């Protein structure tokens, strides 16, 4: 059960920003300094199909509260059809964003760093090889 009564849309909204900032920071720290390359790389990390794939790494290690946030985000009604993802991918991606929104709003910043590392470590390694 969630400690706070946020709705899925609210958790998705803030979680999107949390993930975006964490990815941008990680890319800069990896040595990419050109803003065009940073934007292109960040987009690959935060698009719905990618988030849908990487959240699968997180599901087995989520706490009950994180899992509740995931389900809350994943299950909220989608208005319209997502442009660059299937409805299932979009739902899983918004569920992932809800996890990070929940963690941010409850002050669990170390857990955010750990889950970002777990979710994106393979992609970060590939990115480092291209620098």
Task: Kindly give the residue locations of the regions a language model identified.
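Double-stranded RNA-binding/processing signature
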Residues: 1-131
């Amino acid at each position: 059960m969630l400690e706070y009564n946020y709705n899925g849309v609210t958790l998705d909204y803030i979680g999107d920003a949390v993930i975006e900032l964490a990815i941008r920071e990680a890319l800069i720290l990896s040595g990419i300094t050109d803003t065009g390359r940073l934007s292109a790389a960040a987009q690959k990390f935060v698009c719905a199909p990618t988030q849908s794939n990487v959240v699968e790494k997180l599901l087995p290690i989520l706490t009950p509260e994180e899992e509740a946030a995931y389900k809350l985000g994943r299950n909220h009604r989608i208005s319209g059809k997502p442009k660059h993802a299937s409805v299932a991918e979009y739902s899983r991606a918004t569920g992932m964003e809800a996890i990070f929104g929940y963690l941010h709003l409850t002050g669990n910043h170390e857990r955010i760093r750990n889950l970002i590392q777990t979710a994106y470590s393979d992609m970060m390694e590939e990115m480092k090889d291209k620098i």
